Amino acid sequence: MTAFTVNGTQVTVRQSHPHLLSALREELNITSPKDGCSPSGQCGCCTVLIDGKAVVSCQTSLEKTAGKSVVTLEGFSEREREAFASAFAACGGLQCGFCIPGIVVRAKAQIDKKGVDLKREDMARHLGAHLCRCTGYAKILEAIECVAKNDVPSIPPVAGVGTRTPKYEAKELALGDRGYIDDMRVPGMLHAALHLTAHTRATIRSIRTDAARHADGVRAVYTASDIPGELMVGIIYKDWPVMIPIGGRTSYAGDVLAIVVADTRQQARSAAALIEVDYDVHTPITDVDVALATNEIAVWQTDGNVLSTSAYQRGDVDAALGASSHVISETFHTQRIEHAFLEPEATLAIPSVDSSRRVKVYSGGQGIWDDRNDIARVLGIDNSQVTVELVTNGGAFGGKEDMSNQAHTALAAWLIDAPVKCVLSREESFLMHAKRHPIRMHYEMGCDDHGMLTALRVRAVGDSGAYASVGMKVLERMAGHASGPYHVPAIDVEAIAVRTNNPVGGAFRGFGANQAQFAMEGMLDRLASRVGISGWEIRHRNVIQPGMVWGPGQTMDEGCAGAAACLDAIKPHYDAARAEGLPLGLGLGLKNSGLGNGFKEITRAVVRLEDDGSIEVRHGWTEMGQGINTIALQVLIEELGSHISIDPAKVRVIVDTTRELGLGQTTGSRGTLMGAGAVQAACAAALSAGLARGVDHVGEYRVDWTTKLGDPGVTNPIIHSTFGYAAQLVIMNRETGKVDRVVAAHDVGRAMNPTLCEGQIEGSIHMGLGYALTEDFPSDPTSGFPTNMTLRSLGILRAKDVPKMEVILVERPQPRAPYGIKGVGEIGLVPTAGAVAAALHELDGTWRNRLPMRRAGSDEE
């Protein structure tokens, strides 16, 4: 046993814990320190104070803790807790919130040491021990500065659309009081761990589980033979095995072979490592060109290595290129990227205690209705026997669209008839969930003597890894966005998604538009250089305008005026930097909101008023930091606040499958668009019913008028109903060769909440700069296994590395959209890499065509 004090109380804990974090969370039930990467100590989420010094508790042994004083956020004084909570709420210093408690602890250590003399740049340096994937750090540093200077601003009131309403549950998130799935405890709860494959392409000959079954604390071990229903799941294609059976073949590094259920997480993980597997190993297919050329099938139970082909043509490209004054050809390469959300995937499943044979699953996924349907499929039961409730997650960015461990956890709970929780380790998370696609894009583009574009031909091949996920849609989106926000009279595009034994390629913020825009912006800058005009000028001359035909043939509506408006908003900053002789680059981008491409998007919401003044708002969208619950609250107040008195403290926002409200994933920057529309309609229903109490007032919003990409029978193919636009200016420091400043003008249609909009954009810029300059998630070409298996190795920018950011909100309303909304979550990193590439070219004269980029001759190259 080990004795020490926690928050002023003497405690004694078991010595068997691998580190202090485990003792705090698993034995003492102190959950403000979060487990984002234990035991590597690279995310900072588990930071606590030991004798007044900030340390990461997942790298602190109990031996080093003995006799010392440990303080967590729970032990802060009420004055300190209120100051930090209010500052982060008022400044918008959090989104998903998972990283914030650890950051607050480190901030306290620095404020205790330096007080009002704490400088922003010093705090940024101390945050080098922490990662935040959501915010871009700017508003975090602002909040800390307010606390340090004893100048905490008042929290804005909760109000309607267009106001700086504080984030829903902001104070609870800042203090670590609003729990995530791993913070949940229920009586009789067991823990599950997974055994993953050791080979990316191998036939399973046998799975020996005896040693695991007899290990301490183990209650059960399950393999594919224990699945009572279907083996395969998937969002679009049912091609992803929940587990690989004996006689089956693995297809990527994240394939699951067995589930171990034990009394503790440590016991489950230790026992899972005891499972022995006999493999017949095959050579992995890890190169897209090999996959296209070979007759061998990379992925088990599929009939070929081409997942999809997306193509369209408009005009005579050959003739237009032949008549062009300038024609440029270039091949661009983008890399695979890991989402690195701070909360690893977690699921809690609880079977019913009566004879009804039901199971309730707590999920952090981006599509709980899809989760429900596939869980029922695996268990071989009706959808009505499964309830999935969303627990607001600690970040996702597309990486939690596919199920990770939801089906495994539900299966274990169902079979053992007890509550089961499964939390992935950071390494398991890296191996299992889908990544951003690496894509090779060959562009050939022409223009006339004035820089007016004439034609574009694109041939793209994307490595979609093993299973379908939404890979075909990512390449479809890349194809649709291939020409960017520009008018190109003739166009010919083909994009192929290829199956390999590499990590699965799926949804990631930008969803194919990032890759396309990196190439398109690079082509524009090369043509501008040929013609002898500026980067701003060539974009201004070619930007899409209302009434023009865009890319796949869609005649653009008034909403596209935002593209030119963003260019106009950035122009003074562009001219000023140019006058100073600073190396700069400009990027312009567009990104759809919604799925489009002929998909019928329908969503519903419920508003329920009670006699005690409480209100329930139920919608179908996953809160993952972007603020959809806040928007739902604002719409409620906007629509009903003048009719009834609404106490925000008595409004509860709920997302679960007890009502049929959802359709698909929270993806494509459509959460605010669709969610606001549905809540607005539900409020209208409540008004029509005389604001009746105790009943569900249901509203529906639908976008069912879009057209499939490449449909030749449609005169005006409306591929997407809504687009967001952004212009970003990247300014370099000539001496250091680093990005000094980013100015971002974003057309958001209507700034539903300016603070949330700014935060989304700042976080996107941070992610976009990493994508452009430092981030990578390569895999070994001989094995298919990823090689960067720690958070630090991913190349994510830390707080001290993030340049100054200035956000300009442009509002050009979108016709037919509620409140004129356009999506903002993804567009923020669509133009970034192209802008950085142009700035680097101005710095050293080298054109870039491969991500991530480095300054020529730098020691980072």
List where the protein language model places each region.
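Intrinsic disorder at enzyme termini
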Residues: M1, H126-I181, P552, A564, ...
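Signature of N-terminal electron-transfer/Fe-S-associated modules in redox systems
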Residues: M1-V158, N597
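Glycine-rich loop/linker segments at domain edges
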Residues: G92, T163, E169-L175, G304-T347, ...
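Flexible, low-hydrophobicity surface segments
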Residues: A148-G304, V327, L415
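Short beta-strand elements
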Residues: E172, R178, A346-P351, R440-D449, ...
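C-terminal catalytic domains of large/alpha subunits in multi-subunit enzymes
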Residues: A224-S225, G380-Q385, L415-V420, D449, ...
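Phosphate/diphosphate-binding loops
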Residues: V256, A262-T264, A418-G465, G677-H697
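Helix-loop-helix junctions that connect adjacent transmembrane helices in secondary transporters/permeases
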Residues: A293-L379, V543-S614, Q634, H697-I718, ...
